[in-house]
Amino acid sequence: MRDLLLGTTIPSYFSWLGLFPRFLVWFGFLKASFFCSSRNQSAGESGRRLKMKRAREDVHTDTQKRKPEVSSRGETNKLPRTIDALTYLKAVKDIFHDNKEKYESFLELMKEFKAQTIDTNGVIERIKVLFKGYRDLLLGFNTFLPKGYKITLLPEEEKPKIRVDFKDAIGFVTKIKTRFGDDEHAYKRFLDILNLYRKEKKSISEVYEEVTMLFKGHEDLLMEFVNFLPNCPESAPSTKNAVPRHKGTATTAMHSDKKRKQRCKLEDYSGHSDQREDGDENLVTCSADSPVGEGQPGYFRDYENREDTETDTADRTEKSAASGSQDIGNHKSTTKYVGTPINELDLSECTQCTPSYRLLPKDYAVEIPSYRNTLGKKTLNDHLVSVTSGSEDYSFSHMRKNQYEESLFRCEDDRYEMDMLLGSVSSAIKQVEILLEKMNNNTISVDSTICIEKHLSAMNLRCIERLYGDNGLDVMDLLKKNMHSALPVILTRLKQKQEEWARCHSDFQKVWAEVYAKNHHKSLDHRSFYFKQQDSKNLSTKCLVAEVKDISEKKHQEDLLQAIAVRVMPLFTPDLEFNYCDTQIHEDLYLLIKYYCEEICATEQSDKVMKLWITFLEPIFGILSRSQDNLALEDVSKLKNNRELQDACLAVKETASGSNRKHPISPKRLSKDNTKMQGSSSREDVSANIKVKTAQPDKLQDDAAMTNEVIQSSKFVSPKNDQIMEDEGNHMVNAASVEKHELEEGELSPTASREQSNFEVNGQNAFKPLQKVTDNVRSNKDKQSCDKKGAKNKTRAEDDKQENCHKLSENNKTASEMLVSGTKVSCHEENNRVMNCNGRGSVAGEMANGNQGEDGSFAFSERFLQTVKPVAKHLSWPLQASETCSQNDSQVFYGNDSYYVLFRLHQMLYERIQTAKKHSEKKWKAADNTTPDSYPRFMDALYNLLDGSIDNTKFEDECRAIFGAQSYVLFTLDKLVQKFVKHLHSVASDETDTKLLQLHAYENYRKPGKFFDLVYHENACALLHEANIYRIRYSSEGTRLSIQLMNSGNNQLEVMGVAMEPAFADYLQNKCLKSVNDEENHGLFLNRNKKKFTSLDESRGMPVAMERLNIINEMECRMACSSSKVKYVANTSDLLYRSKQGKPNSRVSEILKQRRISRFHIMLNCRLCALPL
């Protein structure tokens, strides 16, 4: 309640302030007395009830019998009695004795009023909330209120109406239709009354009177109808059959009409009288024609809350019920949608008609809008809703990626603003000129008042205002007051500004073009920033080792010892695999590393790095060593008289060197290195296993490229068809030089003769026997001379082998006997054997002279052979020759973390250079490309970056200009090369790494059939102890490098016994591996296939039946020796399929087609002839 509404004046209010604080003092005294005394000090339960009764009687007396005293309190200035305050406070405490918080809240309220932090209206409002539901306390508090203030209880608060909901309204309408089923006029009249009320043509009183007359004799319907009325007047005329109203609806009709009009203003359903035909008649028709349970629910409202804020929901529900658009059955399921707006519905499960629209739920009450004619009903949409696809909480600013794109955006903003300025000033000039022309032609009277807004638009006026800056408003006033004088001056000023802005626009065009040129390519690159940050971390040793460990733990879950137990070749599953498909990149890497070492590193460091590269990395990847390259080039130079060969050499030279590449070669060494480039140009095809047949006359005069490929192969093997083929190892074995008496496999430390028999040297002199063969291939002599020299070489090789076999017979024990007996070879014997091997200076001595270095760490000499003796001298593993895992087309190396990181850095460098080369080739093959190959241009920029000629920014710009936004992986090449060279030097200087190199060289001295992977692994384990061991294998057949961590659980090859239990061995041989005789073989299941070959015997029918049949046996199983249970290995299976037969060519198809046509005609003629005439 407010002061103005209650008529309380300010003087009376302040006069009452002098009385009410006394009541607060009494409250304070009573509070202290009540809280100091315990509850046991009260007079007992019976006394408390008597006092409570007395208090209620006093309150009732004060509120009803003593009302004149309250109204005259202000005049007589009579104070409330002390006993009244005491009784009221006691009553409050007794009522809330179980709810101390409310009592405390009441006392705090009194304190706040005493401190003047709350006014009388605030006290009344809070008392009504605090004592809600306690009618006696609310009315009793009026005793202490000043004049003009009173707490009144509304009729609704005395007795609330019965709560009704949507289902009750539906049931009521259904009951009416059922009750008046025989009297259709009564039901239609009821609907008409509701529609008239909806159109504000009848008040609540009138509706009640008419419904009372309509429901005469149906008192139950009238009583139920009263519950749906908002405020039914107590004075409404009633008949003797009318149901008497309760006190809760004692509200005047005028008040009800006002509230109804207020609700109608919020949502007007119908504003014209002709809507009765569209709305009410439809309602009546649908209700009359529908059966019980499917009719219309009629008019209903939710009258639980009658606040104005809820009228929207009530009106929407009312309209849906009276519109006739849904039946009662549907309305029963719409209760969950009552009051729910469309934007809060969950439409994810609704039918999607288009990407933007969905159908409303079938049980949702659809509102029928007003002012809709027949055409609107046919065309307008009521059931499709646009789905929310975004949110306004997020800004619409573009997600900018980098600073270069920001520059482009700023440039675009400047251009847009400049264009808008020029456009606006041009438009203003045009309109001003038109206006002046009209004034000069007297089209517009000069004496009359001219409205400037009719001739100039708002944009033109704004342009003029901005033209004068701070004085723009004054100019606009002058323009309106004296247009004839101001317009010419403004026009001149506009033209001057237009010329000035045009010059600025022309000058800025150059600046904008420069900004675009500098930032366009950089703006497209949004990954380089993050790549640079992550690349330094990815190149670290810790990150690389952690990567392979994670892969190894996830990939290798099976135990390899199961396969070893059944004497099967261990299944090595690499953790990492990399492809080296382009061998020409190895030459580019060599030149790159060499150039960097010469420019940056010291001479000693450069020599160590390049020696490790030449003697270790290149042989691993099957690249011909530099010394062998020189020998091959000498042979090529002998064939210069061949014109065709000279042309081929020139082409190879141009291909390898490149036209635009910056060569890291001094002028003094230019001719020498150019010759090397010729020899190395054909290395791209080394790993492709190119074979040159020496027995065919037409291949005797091959070109220099093919001849050079044969010479550069790092390992030659002579197969049965007398072909010279390339391999990855460093051994050369002739077909005629195979020994007749081989050593026992697995011997780790042979004598001098056996050492020489098992090992072949990889030096320069090792190429001398092959040199004669290659000379014969390259010469122009006939086939006979080639055959004679080949026979001569074979005879010489056989003599050497006979001598070796004679010496082999003098050995005391074979290698297998040593392994089984466990006899250890003493170091003294080992040294003697190595010395005996060194005594054969015809091989090892010449090799040492050819490859001995300054420090001797990588030289293949006698002293080197003494340091690479086998570390593990005894193995309890009876290895067989068939168990060797080294093949002629692969190289195996066991190393530690340093070598693993070395190969990973090499692979990363190779991959990035390969990426540049692929992008260059792709760009060069484009149809619209007119520029030459961009790869030499890129390499030249990289060399300039390494020697400091350009900085990183220019190098990045050059890469973007060449390859585009995909070139971000090339930005850190200088960091990668620097880290790679530093790591190469670290490996070359480390003692453990050097021993691993020596062990690898020792194992590679074995013949191809004498190399044992397990022996090599055991020696590496003995050397590295607990450190990580990596198996690094390069296969030239597939040009793939595989890396496997050998220390992770199941991958470790531990020595174990392989003895098989006799019972299990008998079961395996007799049951599982027993071959089935022909007599025991049962018939085939597919008999139709057998009939095709019944005319053939087994020997001739089997090849025909197996034609185009492919069988892949990959099913693996494991058998327990104790229980003989078989367990199949997951992800393994056998496969049998027959490949499709090749389609015949068009000529054969045509012949077959003609044959079929002819056979058809013959058959048709026979049938026609057989027909009776």
From Swiss-Prot:
Top-level taxon in the UniProt lineage: Eukaryota
Gene Ontology molecular function terms on file: transcription corepressor activity
Matching SMART domains: HDAC_interact (SM00761)
Segments for region (Disordered): 40-75, 236-337, 655-697, 740-813
Biased composition (Basic and acidic residues): 55-75, 264-276, 301-319, 778-810
Leader sequence segment: none
Subcellular location: Nucleus
Residue ranges of every copy of the PAH domain listed in the record: 79-148, 162-232
Biased composition (Polar residues): 320-337, 750-765
Entry keywords, A to Z: Nucleus, Repeat, Repressor, Transcription, Transcription regulation
PANTHER family: PAIRED AMPHIPATHIC HELIX PROTEIN SIN3-LIKE 6, SIN3B-RELATED
This protein's name: Paired amphipathic helix protein Sin3-like 6
Species this protein is from: Arabidopsis thaliana
Highest classification ranks of the organism: Eukaryota, Viridiplantae, Streptophyta, Embryophyta, Tracheophyta
